[in-house]
Structure formats: structure tokens, C-alpha cells
Amino acid sequence: MSAPRSGSLVGLYGVSCPSATSCFAVGSTLTKSGGSLVERWNGRAWSASTTPVPRNASFAALQSVSCTSAARCLAVGDDGSPGVYADSWNGTGWHLVPMTTTGGHIGAFSAVTCLAATSCAALGATTQFAASARSESAFWNGTRWKVARTA
């Protein structure tokens, strides 16, 4: 298996392989305008997928992905505006999943894990100012997120 997008200016931050012939790697293009990036391994080669980002995103980076099958993945990251975002894969395309933090402050979810398509947990941080940073978690039930502060 060769590295995705060899020679391109990209950063890959997370990977999930639901089978030996299916892997998804997520990250961002490392350009001034930025943009989320998903690479998919089909057992023979990597291919790029486009992902939607929130309308007001100033920079988009997917930080983590978790796949329960080749047809079900959830990826989380940072949209550069005051907010986090998530994308889901349904086997044919990526779709934006609405998500907010508890305080509406700048945030980034950096990890996600899914036990099933309807049971995922994400972890990250939000901050209004450097001195007020705090951890946050969110739980996905397949329909919506429930955000909670961590201890």
C-alpha cells in the first residue's frame, strides 16, 4: 500500500480500515485556503473523495475518522470558523452532519470512534480565549449529536 497523494501538499491525520480492502484516511490540503481531504483505499489504489464543509468555513481539516463498514464512516474536524464539523460516508458519498459545541466557541474535535453506525463518540476542545480552554465530548446516535462537557 503506497501513501495517498504522493507529492501533493496534504496532511493526513487519521485513518480507519473496516476491512483489508477498505481504508479511509482524512486530513486537509495544506494550502492558504485549506480544505478537507479524504483518501479511500479499495485494496489496490488510493483515490480522493470530496467532502462538504460548513458554509462559513474559513479553513477545513478533518482530524479523525471511524468506519464501522466500507459503507459507514464518520469523520470529525475543525472548520476554521468558530466551530467543529462532521462528515458522514454512506457508501456512495460524503454528507455534512450538523454539529455545534456547548458554548459556540472556537473548537476542534480531534478524535472519533464508532461501535456502530448509530453509536459514535467524539472528543475535542473548545475555547473562547486561551485561558478558558476546555475539553468536550459529543455522542452520535445516528440522527443527531448530544454534546457534553468532560470532567
Please report, for each region that a protein language model flagged, where it lies by residue.
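Residue-level hotspots at or immediately adjacent to binding/recognition sites across diverse folds
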Residues: M1-A151
